[in-house]
């Protein structure tokens, strides 16, 4: 009853949140306690509480790890042509990333990672060495991207999420599919590089 009519899990903190030092776990969007709908505004244990009626409208369309939930203080509309151009640039960047991985061109692949990239406590140089030893040693036959979702960060201008299903097929035929999240940063020159990433 405390969580109302329904609840949906969030991926907070995601890789970018952790990069910024944000902490927490078990964060949900949930309804309000029907027995006492007058809880203090911020009494949600770090979760987001919405009226039950609003959440029930979303219940049939919400899929965990599929439906994007964007939380921001305000909404800004931008020109559709600017959105289309940015989408095209991001799609090309993701395609270059996949092609370099498939071709085994580790230097082109690693060049798509930002100098300020961090992963598993490693800086870019440490992570590059690790990747050359692990990813670079794989005998990859094909890399396939599907279900690509592109989102702009609601707060930080020039930061984008590319979430997709990544299928890597080895030369022997074995295939592994994961859900990959890459966070791309656009530089002043317009170049896109990966600043953070995570599976799941």
Task: Give, region by region, the residue ranges found by the protein language model.
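Short, well-ordered alpha-helical segments enriched in acidic and aromatic residues
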Residues: 103-116, 120
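Short beta-strand edge/turn micro-motifs at domain boundaries
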Residues: 174-200
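Short, well-ordered strand-loop elements centered on a beta-strand within folded domains, enriched
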Residues: 3-7, 24-26, 161-163, 189-199
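Surface-exposed, charged secondary-structure patches
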Residues: 132-181
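Hydrophobic pocket/interface hotspot
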Residues: 97, 109-110, 127, 162, ...
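Short, solvent-exposed aromatic-acidic interface loops
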Residues: 30-34, 166-169, 195-200
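Exported/periplasmic cell-wall-interacting domains
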Residues: 1-95
């Amino acid at each position: 009853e405390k969580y109302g009519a329904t609840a949906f899990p969030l991926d907070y903190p995601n890789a970018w949140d952790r990069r910024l030092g944000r902490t927490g776990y078990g964060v949900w969007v949930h309804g309000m306690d029907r027995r006492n709908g007058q809880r203090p505004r911020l009494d949600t244990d770090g979760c987001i509480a919405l009226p039950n009626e609003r959440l029930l409208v979303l219940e049939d369309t919400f899929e965990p790890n599929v439906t994007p939930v964007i939380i921001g203080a305000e909404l800004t509309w931008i020109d559709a042509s600017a959105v289309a151009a940015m989408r095209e640039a991001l799609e090309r960047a993701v395609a270059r990333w996949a092609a370099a991985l498939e071709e085994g061109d580790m230097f082109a692949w690693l060049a798509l990672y930002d100098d300020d990239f961090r992963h598993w406590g490693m800086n870019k140089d440490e992570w590059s060495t690790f990747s050359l030893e692990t990813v670079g040693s794989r005998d990859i036959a094909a890399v396939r991207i599907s279900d690509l979702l592109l989102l702009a960060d609601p707060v930080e201008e020039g930061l984008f999420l590319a979430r997709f299903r990544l299928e890597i097929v080895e030369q022997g035929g074995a295939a592994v599919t994961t859900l990959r999240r890459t966070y791309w940063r656009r530089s002043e020159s317009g170049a896109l590089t990966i600043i953070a990433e995570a599976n799941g």
